[in-house]
Amino acid sequence: MNQYIKKETRLADFDPCPRFIWNEGLSSLAISVYTLLLGRVSLSKQNDMIDEQGRVYVIYTVKHMAEKLSRSEPPIYAALKMLEEKGLIERKSSGKGNPNHIYVKIKP
């Protein structure tokens, strides 16, 4: 049964969703993908997934994103493309057979 949130209620783990994202003209799936990727940044920091320029990157395969969001892979690819076009992520190849490094960007 669901409970009301009270002052002493501890919230379970959640992925952050910054307020600026709602004004970017993105699909709801693209917002979900961005939120998922932004949530993964904390884990990347803990695991020292930092490039030579000091930028944190995320490794998250399209297959796993699709599973997490209960979607097929083509809509995830479209959402990633939309996020790239808006300048909110950047994908860099990490070599043949390896997953891309995804740099998640935020607005200052």
Residue ranges of model-derived segments:
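Short recognition helix of helix-turn-helix/winged-helix DNA-binding domains
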Residues: 1-63
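Winged helix-turn-helix DNA-binding recognition segment
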Residues: 43-104
